[in-house]
């Protein structure tokens, strides 16, 4: 990016910029961060800031835009949110002391995956992901730079990689291998990711356990290298890498989590109306993030779940202590992110005060937990390190009224440093000392109007008018002569002035140095602070789940090994919260050990989808350790949940509703086990009726015969209810309705057996369609039903007659060309009683080829 005829300062800019071609370079110049050339033009448009130029009178003025240093973060946030990278070039020396061009260096590169600063205290994790491939398996590693969390796993296929990236809600992915343009497009366009290619791995890091697989090590090493290259400093808050296996958690795709509104409402994109919203009674930012993590990754082992349940039960049994605990957690700040600010060298006095305030509360929180007197809490109590020495350091060192910046002074508490106290005394009492000198010299000299003034050139001086020059004492020395007066100094005044100037200059730098030393001391406690943060976050989530359980009258679920689901008067926890307890109608759910499929029929808007989601949310709540919305519940432990609820075209990739349905159905039947839960709502509706019914039946049979997963299958194909006569593990249920005087009431209650009507026109009436249109629909429906019955009657008679005729005919009636015998053999081999629709279509196609 060489430019001709540029100044030394601009050449410095160009030299730095060439190393960061893919980032906006914010170049510190005095009180502004400036952008030049293409960066300025783009930034002016994106940030809506003024675009000007440097050297306006030159033949080719340099485009320039700038933002004030004190508000730069808000502009950085905008660029990062739009998926850009930002490089920060700071002045590395005092411009007043610099010889020639001020030395500047890039001190940090901020990217979507490494952004730390946020104006939202409750902001979720921001994960940076790295992926590598060794030809057989994929290694995936991710980190939240703002908290230091660091994880890695290995995955069998790229579909699993994409699913994990979606579940992490990553904004930036590092690739250590070549990826096809098609797959890159999926990541960039469909998943809105910033892709970077990283080929260098950081080796021999103490953060990485070398027991990992080689591909995991490679992904983790490349992620660490990228973080070091962008943050340009050692980060003491980064935690030791933790290996995980996705099979250790209840597996759910991003689409499943979205359809169940786990972390946000899929329709609004907001927290309100989600399971996270329902369960969130946390008091700390750390607790909020951990609750999201628990909802995102429910457990699959009963021991860990029961441990959480026991603590929730302890909290429920002691209302006063639990209320005290909740109140004490309210004043706890975000220890994880405060620690990261210390590690980044960005912690200001207010940050340390927040940390100190939090540590001051910890002994009381620990005492409250001990007051529960429960062995189930012993592990958590032992993890709570009160760090009294760190709390004492911050309390004794940092002034409680300290400003948020480190260069304004008034940071260090009086009494912490003797030298600083002396300087402050000089500054505080110096003006009094000068007033005393003025009074003393006025009285001694007899000059009644003698006074001391100050300016930057002469400093402090005695002001003597010409009429009093004869009375000037001998120990006065002249500093300046004016037209009507002269300025004098004395040794005593010079001494006081020197002390005051020294105090003013030295106290500022001394206070800065003291603060830096304190911050460095705090940094040595980061490991212990992070362990404390984890313990407090766990306490916070468990008390939150206890509060929610008590408020909403939830019960403790039991787990069984008989593959049995028994939920008595269960509720969809989120819908109940939105509607209110009085309006919600509960439903029991029962799957015996030998029942694998519930076929659900009933009209639209009757509650089929809510009933299905109710089971899924009950399972998820139970497996995060929460109590559940029911009068009682006994469940098996599930290993995965697969859903297809709600229809939506994939507009970006051009896939129709039907294609998405089939892909999700394929994903479920291939990956589900007998310990999985499958929820299919109206599968097959995206194609022609008979195609859809054939596929729906085939999928039901496949799940019944080969998969064995607990399945809820809601359908409008009433013909499928006949499957219960031949599929022994399938039962029919329907949503009950009440029909009286032409009016239909949906009871939202699940009953045994199939539905007898769909009530589609009634739903249309509720939707407000014109009455004349609905009357026409009723007439058409009556006619179609009559035609259908007549057609079925004729078909039945014809089939009987043709069968009898065929029995009396001789084989010689067929042309003897050889194909007839093949057709007969093929027909004889067909098991008509067990033929599925899709298999029948296949046989018909084969027979047609033989003709």
From Swiss-Prot:
GO terms for cellular component: cytosol. GO terms for biological process: mismatch repair. SMART domains: MUTSac, MUTSd. ATP binds at residues 602-609. Belongs to the DNA mismatch repair MutS family. This protein is involved in the repair of mismatches in DNA. It is possible that it carries out the mismatch recognition step. This protein has a weak ATPase activity. This is DNA mismatch repair protein MutS. It comes from Streptococcus equi subsp. zooepidemicus (strain H70). The lineage of its organism: Bacteria, Bacillati, Bacillota, Bacilli, Lactobacillales. The gene is mutS.
């Amino acid at each position: 990016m060489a430019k001709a005829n540029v100044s030394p300062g601009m050449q410095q800019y160009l030299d730095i910029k060439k190393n960061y071609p893919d980032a906006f370079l914010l170049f510190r110049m005095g009180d502004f961060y400036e952008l030049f050339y293409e960066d300025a033009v783009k930034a002016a448009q994106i940030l809506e800031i003024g675009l000007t130029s440097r050297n306006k009178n030159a033949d080719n003025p340099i485009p320039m835009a700038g933002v004030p240093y004190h508000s730069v973060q808000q502009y950085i946030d905008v660029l990062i949110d739009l998926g850009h990278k930002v490089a920060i070039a700071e002045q590395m020396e005092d411009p007043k002391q610099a010889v020639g061009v001020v030395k500047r260096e890039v001190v940090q590169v901020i990217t979507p995956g490494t952004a730390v600063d946020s104006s939202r205290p409750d902001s979720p994790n921001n994960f940076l992901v790295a992926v590598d491939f060794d030809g057989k398996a994929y290694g995936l590693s991710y980190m939240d730079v703002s908290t230091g969390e660091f994880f890695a796993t290995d995955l069998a296929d790229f579909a699993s990689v994409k699913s994990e990236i979606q579940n992490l809600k990553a904004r930036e992915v590092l690739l250590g291998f070549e990826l096809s343009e098609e797959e890159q497009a999926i990541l960039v366009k469909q998943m809105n990711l910033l892709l970077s290619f990283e080929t260098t791995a950081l080796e021999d890091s103490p953060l990485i356990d070398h027991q990992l697989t080689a591909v995991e090590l490679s992904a983790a090493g490349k992620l660490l290298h990228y973080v070091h290259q962008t943050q340009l400093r050692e980060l003491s808050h980064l935690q030791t890498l933790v290996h995980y296996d996705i099979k250790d958690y209840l597996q759910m795709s991003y689409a499943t989590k979205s359809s169940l509104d786990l972390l946000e409402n899929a329709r609004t994109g907001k927290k309100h109306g989600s399971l996270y919203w329902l369960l969130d009674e946390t008091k700390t930012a750390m607790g909020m993030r951990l609750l999201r993590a628990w909802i995102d990754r429910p457990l699959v082992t009963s021991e860990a779940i029961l441990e959480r349940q026991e603590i929730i039960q302890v909290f429920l049994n002691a209302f006063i202590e639990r209320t005290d605990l909740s109140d004490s957690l309210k004043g706890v700040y975000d220890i994880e992110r405060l620690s990261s600010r210390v590690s980044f060298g960005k912690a200001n006095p207010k940050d340390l005060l927040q940390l100190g305030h939090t540590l001051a509360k910890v002994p009381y929180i620990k005492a409250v937990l001990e007051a529960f007197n429960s062995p189930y809490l012993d592990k958590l109590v032992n993890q709570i390190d009160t760090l009294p020495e760190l709390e004492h350091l911050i309390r004794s060192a940092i002034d409680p009224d300290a400003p948020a910046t480190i260069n304004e002074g008034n940071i260090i508490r009086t009494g912490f440093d003797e030298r600083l106290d002396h300087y402050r005394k000089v500054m505080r009492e110096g003006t009094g000392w000068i007033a005393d000198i003025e009074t003393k010299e006025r009285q001694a000299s007899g000059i009644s109007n003698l006074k001391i003034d100050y300016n930057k050139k002469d400093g402090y001086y005695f002001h003597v008018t010409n009429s009093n020059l004869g009375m000037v004492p001998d120990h006065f020395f002249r500093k300046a002569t004016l037209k009507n007066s002269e300025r004098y100094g004395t040794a005593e005044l010079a001494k006081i002035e020197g002390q005051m100037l020294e105090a003013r200059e030295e106290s500022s730098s001394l206070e800065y140095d003291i603060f830096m030393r304190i911050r460095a001391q705090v940094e040595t406690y980061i490991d212990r602070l992070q362990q404390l943060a984890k313990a407090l976050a766990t306490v916070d989530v468990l008390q939150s789940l206890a509060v929610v359980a008590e408020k909403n009258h939830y019960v403790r679920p039991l787990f069984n090994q008989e593959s049995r689901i028994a939920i008595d008067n269960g509720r969809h926890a989120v819908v109940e919260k939105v509607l209110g307890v009085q309006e919600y109608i509960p439903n029991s759910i029962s799957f015996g050990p030998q029942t694998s499929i519930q076929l659900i029929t009933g009209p639209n808007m009757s509650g089929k989808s809510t009933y299905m989601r109710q089971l899924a949310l009950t399972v998820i709540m139970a497996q995060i350790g929460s109590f559940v919305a029911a009068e009682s519940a006994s469940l098996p432990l599930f290993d995965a949940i697969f859903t297809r609820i709600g229809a939506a075209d994939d507009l970006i990739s051009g896939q129709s509703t039907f294609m998405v349905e089939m892909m999700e159905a394929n994903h479920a039947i291939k990956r589900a086990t007998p310990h999985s839960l499958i929820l299919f709502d109206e599968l097959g509706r995206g194609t022609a009726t008979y195609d859809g019914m054939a596929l729906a039946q085939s999928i039901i049979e496949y799940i019944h015969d080969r998969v064995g997963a607990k399945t809820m299958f809601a359908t409008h194909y009433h013909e499928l209810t006949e499957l219960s006569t031949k599929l022994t593990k399938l039962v029919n249920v329907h949503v009950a309705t009440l029909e009286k005087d032409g009016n239909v009431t949906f009871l939202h209650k699940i009953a045994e057996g199939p539905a007898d009507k769909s009530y589609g026109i009634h739903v249309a009436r509720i939707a407000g369609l014109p009455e004349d249109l609905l009357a026409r629909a009723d007439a058409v429906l009556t006619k179609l039903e009559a035609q259908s019955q007549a057609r079925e009657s004729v078909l039945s008679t014809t089939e009987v007659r043709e069968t009898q005729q065929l029995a009396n005919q001789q084989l010689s009636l067929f042309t003897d060309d050889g194909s007839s015998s093949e057709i007969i053999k093929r027909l004889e081999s067909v098991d008509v009683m067990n033929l599925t629709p899709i298999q029948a279509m296949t046989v018909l196609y084969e027979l047609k080829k033989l003709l």
